[in-house]
Amino acid sequence: GFLEYAENIGDYLPVRTEKLFFHQFAGAEVIKTRLYDDFHNADADRHIVYLKAANAFVVVDTVHPRAAQEMTTGVMYHAEHISPVEPGVYRVQEETAEGLMHFHRYKSASRAHAQQSLCIAFAGEGVSYSMEAQRRNYRQETALSCYTSRYYGADEYYSYVSLLIPETGETKQEIEAQRARALGIVHSLRTAHTRMGRSLTVQLKADGLEYTIGIQCDDGACIEDKNLRPTYSYEVGRASYGAFETDAKFLVSDGRTYGMIDGSRVDHRGKTLFSAYPNRCNQLDFVTVLQRAGTWGSYEDVL
């Protein structure tokens, strides 16, 4: 399994991490972090998107090797008890009082509600799953992994998509209803990516809303090299995410509203919803003038 492979690497390797942005929209929140692994000559980005109305989390982990190489990569979740539901779908049971006793200053309290849980689903094809026992945090836990071993081309991006849905309630009947709802959302989950994985689309349906998440995995996708000086271009950076087309680094929509981060234009079904004010850019020869547009840090509106 993936845990055994990771343990065979040896000691923890030094890495650097960085928070790139955190933004709150009316219907969603998103945070992006990056891990720099100089030992493996690769980087990894993580987007955590919280869909407020759906009360669900979409976690996207993108691996980007800096050179062509073979790698085994994956994502791993830890919990006291994890059980399989169907291929690629798992249920994390609520922590028990005995399992939490090792935490500092924890005091056992009587339960006033039924046993709650968390649904974890993985999207994508060609991946493997493993569940392995692990001694962690002074107790016995289960490590749930979604991983793959493959050859990465130069400038290739590979994304793992996880969907996390809390299954909560005060009674057993309420929790069972939430579990049925969670499976309905899981079965609507769809992903798509462009060549070399440079952009990723995640779509799902929840409570009558159709969500679209678009991620530009390649930070340099919008840079156009005109030999004299690199310039920003919407035409070079644009990508399609379902019914949307934009050059934004991130886009999220629930079918009624939309929000984007670091983009100059957003189109929906061929109609321009947002466009930054155009400007002109001189080349270093002071003769050639390029028509360009600056990006906005963020923007949101109704469709």
Regions found by a protein language model. Give the residues of each.
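Catalytic and substrate-binding regions of extracellular carbohydrate-active enzymes
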Residues: G1-E98, A154-Y158, T168
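Short conserved micro-motifs at the rims of enzyme active sites and ligand-binding pockets
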Residues: L13, A44, M131-A133, T171-I175
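Short, well-ordered strand-loop elements centered on a beta-strand within folded domains, enriched
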Residues: F57-V60, T73-V75, S117-C119, S130, ...
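Short, flexible beta-strand-to-coil junctions
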Residues: H64-R66, E95-T96, Y106-A109, H113, ...
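Trp/Gly-enriched beta-strand surface patches
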Residues: E86-C146, I223
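A surface-exposed beta-strand-loop module
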Residues: R139-S159
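Non-catalytic terminal regions with compositionally biased, polar/charged low complexity
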Residues: E156, I165-L303
